[in-house]
Amino acid sequence: MTVMEERFELASQRILEIEKRMPEQFQRYFAENADYLGVLLEEYKWVASGAMREASLQELERHNESCFIDLMGRNYETSYANPDWAYAQLGETFGQLLCAVAAELRSLPAFIYEQDLEGITIRLELFVEIYCAFAESFEETKEAPEYSRIRDIFYWFASDYAELTAEHAIRHTVDWGQRFALDIIENADLSDIRYLFRFGEYIADDQWKLAEHLNGLPEEKIQKIADTYTEGFRKGFELAKKPLDKKKSVQIRYPLGFERVVKAAIENFRKMGLEPVIARTPASFAEGRRVFRLGFFGGAVNRQFDYDHENDKALYLDKKYVHRMLECRKNAWEEYKDMAVVHAGPAVIEAFGEEPFEPASKEHLLTLSAEQQKLYVEYQSQAGAMTNEYIDPEERSFTCIAFPVSISRRFSTKC
């Protein structure tokens, strides 16, 4: 057993043994989140067993729903991942902080389905460490722990794993050796829409109906769509007089349901000498999850949830953290610099026509202070400059093809 496997087993066992050792106000929070984590631990075993491949469509739907249940519809109103509910239940001192922890735990389905043991373990350990801090404090002093103690646990979670966060971000941009999504796209029976559930994303009606619609199209039509998409990318280099023959990879970003088109596009790109880079949009707020999504992604289980937690970084964003993140990104770019220099840029499939999203302005959202806003702008600026240092903007391109969300409309393209 590896060290990481031992850590995973210890954290898992501790979660399953959570006891009633504190006032009901906090006990409910830890019990409900422990129950959710217990469901995900069973999901981890189920995915690892391979049983998913033989499961019925109805069973797959049940599993998918269980991963996202408390973010769905009206369930979110009484979820500890909802800032206003968490504040009402946990109080002014801990409401926002423990809500941010709950939100971070909701990123776990992505790590579960990719069988990313480290990504799972560090989030289980975050929860266990915070639980133990509360349990020990109530046992020893009959009082809740100091806010600073719990905030420091969350801060050091973000800071200690900044190296992992940065490595993920850069690898997901340029490393064509990633196989998770590619294996599904290239090897699954795409005529059987059960394949959609293997991605570990929320599967809504749009993904389901889109995949069914594309399955009903002849191969010639699929190829024509893929050709329009990939030719747009090639012509971008041609028109800008940029050397495509120097490049070895292209990042494919798309919403789930388009797998038949993406599979055909992959073959087109390979004929150009480009290997596909296909990675998930960030699932974790610590890794950059937001309303606007990059990479491959499923349905938006709850855009209000994404909006509510975009500024959870207010709990750890300071000069020290920014310096560490930039240092970690620099190290990650150095690690992947040979892949970065031959990266051609993103080829994007978009969907338009979604119902407009108007977020509710909740009273207890975390917000960045003026100083933090300044720091974040500085971080974004330096991170962007670093990207341009390793992927020369004069030698990369971009294309986008867009389709209406509703499959009842005629498909249209823009490149």
Model-based region annotation:
Residues T2-C415:
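Active-site bordering "gate/hinge" segments
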